[in-house]
Amino acid sequence: MIPACDWYESIPFADAITLIHEPWMPPFYRCNMWHIKGRDRDLLVDTGLGAYPLRDNVPLLQGRPITCLTSHTHFDHNGSTHEFADRLVHAAEAHVLADPQDDDTLFAKYTGGNRDGDMFIDHPEGWNAGTYRIPPAPATGLVAEGDVIDLGDRAFTVLHTPGHSPGHLSLWEAATGTLIAQDVVYDGPLVTECRGADIGVYVATMRRLREIEPRIVHGGHYASFGAVRFRQLIDKFLEGKGCVSHPGR
């Protein structure tokens, strides 16, 4: 059993971006949370499972104003969103953020048949899938394609990247060539068959993303990668080789 003080890990990247994750979960289930430091405020993309309070256990998230962007409302990405006062999401998934039912967040599908054990390398203390609930976190703002999140000295453009979920969001920072893709594209098996997924929409999103030339891509799971791997992953997906289903998400 892993205590709260050891549950989260923070790993700094270039351009004042830090990965926060839960290293006691396998990569497929381990959400990559991305903290971006700005002059006037910071930005956090996604909040993980929420097995333990996030802000209390990650010093980086204390003492500064933070805008929390929910890329999509699956349970592994928004378990601690309620801890933040400034909460952004796409309109298509705002109802789930406000009232996170287990079917909508895919938690019911994931934990059915005692499969929640697959989610952990080692369990958080006191974990009980039967009593786990994501607290409501109504959005304080809605964002859509083309909106800009301004941190004072840097800005990210919002990309609506549906397919994995109807309101999935990614972020693009042209100045650094950084794409925070989250679950639309990462270096692992992509999920195309789950509640809210649409393979036709997903294909259109991937074709649009293929036109971007990133320096680095930060996905919602697995390791970050560069432009060549980005194109490889999209091309493989579009060829029909990356369209796999998984019972979890």
Sequence positions of predicted segments:
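Structural signal for conserved beta-strand scaffold positions within catalytic alpha/beta enzyme cores
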Residues: 12, 19, 70, 88-89, ...
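Structural motif
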Residues: 12, 60-61, 79, 153, ...
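Short Pro/Gly-enriched beta-strand edge/turn motifs at strand-loop
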Residues: 14-21, 127-132, 152-154
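Metallo-beta-lactamase
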Residues: 42-44, 49-50, 132-134, 138-141, ...
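Basic/polar N-terminal segments that are highly enriched at the extreme N-terminus
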Residues: 1-5
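Conserved beta-strand hairpin/beta-sheet module of binuclear metal-dependent hydrolase folds
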Residues: 7-60, 170-186
